[in-house]
Curated annotation (Swiss-Prot):
It comes from Methanococcus aeolicus (strain ATCC BAA-1280 / DSM 17508 / OCM 812 / Nankai-3). The record marks 175, 230 as: Could be important to modulate the pK values of the two catalytic cysteine residues. The gene is dapF. This is Diaminopimelate epimerase. It catalyses: (2S,6S)-2,6-diaminopimelate = meso-2,6-diaminopimelate. Its EC number is 5.1.1.7.
Amino acid sequence: MGLNFTKMHGLGNDYIVINEFDGEKIKEDEKAEFSKKICKRGFSIGADGVIFVQPATDEKYDIRFRIFNSDGSEAEMCGNGIRCFSKFVYERVMQKNPLNVETMGGLRVSEMNIENNIVKSIKVFMGAPTFELKDIPMVVEGKSENDVFLDEEIELKNALLNSVKLSVVNVGNPHAVIFMKDNNLKAPFIRTHLNILGKEIEHHSVFPEKINVHFVEIVNPQEIKIITWERGAGYTTACGTGTTSSVIIANKLGKTGNKVLAHLDGGDLEIEIKEDGVYMEGDAVIVYDGELYQY
């Protein structure tokens, strides 16, 4: 008998969902290597990451969300992933709405728009952002761990750019946001050289635990476009926490309002900044169920 799984995606960001709510399917010390192996496109199922549905470890949560990237690293949070997770949980595990989700990045609350017991869209309370360098983490000469890094430059070592101006924020996981116009960059240039630029910034020495990278174009105060390079996954069609971070930084620097429509390669997300925190809204899709025999 094989291992049951569900393939899902959120704006083209695709995941393999493993239901461990009623018991462990993959041993804890094997989850990283398992995820790395089955995410390899062309050789196994192929995905940007693996989501494990688990019982909560504390009664204040309804259920636990865990996600491993395609390189085997475990991430604290994932915006597109948690929307997929929430749809899966409501339709396959427990019909609870809203859903209090335990993540490594803290509590996330999913509120689902439901029609005929099918989840059509999910609004997730993403919590409040943190900007201090200790929360990224980021190590910068001349700055303390309580300082922030907003609209400042870091040096690069590639032949394309000597430096780049960026801002950093943590929304459960860390993100670097780069506004293309402020760096005299155009989207075609970024797309052509994303493997070089995204990878170098992700692995830059100032980020000891690496970082997610987003190149942002401001369309108008209510609309942005984003090109994403995810930590541990590389280019992806969308990133929910990255979109949230991009809007937070854009708003903080006076470039956008509190409610923004973000266009990503995989589709659109709506982000709203309120007094109690930030909300992300978008859909999620169950593509197919399957059974894995070699892993």
